[in-house]
Swiss-Prot record:
Coiled-coil portions: none
Taxonomic lineage of the native organism: Eukaryota, Viridiplantae, Streptophyta, Embryophyta, Tracheophyta
Annotated protein name in UniProt: NADH dehydrogenase [ubiquinone] iron-sulfur protein 8, mitochondrial
Transit peptide feature, positions: 1-42
Amino acids binding [4Fe-4S] cluster 2: C141, C170, C173, C176
């Protein structure tokens, strides 16, 4: 790289010198012709270099100096590995600063009360199922992930005999929670439910009720905190 820059600089300087030599020779020839013809000439500023020539020389000198400075700086960086040292210093700086990550899964960040995760089916405090088999959640689900079957009980109330959710279809839009008149189906706080098989993601009623029993305290608190905005 240094050799290329030096070669270019010398070529530019040689070209400039040839141009100046040609101009000087032309001026000398004109002066000789004027003397032979008896024309009296006097030395003026035009016989020497003009301001434009001086500016061009200064500009050329600056460019040469700039090129050599860049070559020198590059050689210094290569010799003393300054760029590597600069990178190591940056690493050392962040080594002692406060960490921006957490040690997942042993540490977990906070979740919003509006977080939409794995769904549960809730119960009343008495243990009775909340779901009344109105099928509004099944009707509003855009992914058609919910399947409900129901029958009437002896007391005349309706309860589900089948409540399935295909978690591979669910898009966690929360429409089922908004449509439910009794807060039976909600979006839960759990996001860690990866499985090894597809069948494990086909949730039945027992699985959903089990989720509801596990997270009831947290779900009730989230619904209470968000009740002002519903």
């Amino acid at each position: 790289m240094a050799a290329i820059l030096a070669r270019k600089s010398l070529s530019a300087l040689r070209s400039r010198q040839l141009v100046l030599a040609g101009q000087a020779w032309q001026q000398g020839a004109n002066t000789s012709n004027g003397t032979l013809l008896g024309t009296r000439t006097f030395a003026t500023n035009d016989s020497f270099s003009t301001d434009k020539d001086d500016e061009e020389r200064e500009q050329l000198a600056k460019e040469l100096s700039k090129d050599w400075n860049s070559v020198f700086e590059q050689q210094i960086n290569t010799l003393f590995l300054t760029e590597m040292v600069r990178g190591l210093m940056l690493t050392l700086k962040y080594f002692f600063e406060k960490k921006v990550t957490i040690n997942y899964p042993f540490e977990k960040g906070p979740l919003s009360p509006r977080f939409r995760g794995e769904q549960p089916l809730r119960r009343y405090p008495t243990g009775e199922e909340r779901c009344i088999a109105c099928k509004l959640c099944e009707a509003i689900c855009p992914a058609q992930a919910i399947t409900i079957e129901a029958e009437a009980r002896e007391d005349g109330s309706r309860r589900t005999t089948r409540y399935d959710i295909d978690m591979t279809k669910c898009i966690y839009c929360g429409f089922c929670q908004e449509a439910c008149p009794v807060d039976a189906i909600v979006e839960g706080p759990n996001f860690e439910f990866a499985t090894e098989t597809h069948e494990e993601l086909l949730y039945d009623k027992e699985k959903l009720l089990e989720n509801g029993d596990r997270w009831e305290t947290e779900i009730a608190e989230n619904l209470r905190s968000e009740s002002l905005y519903r």
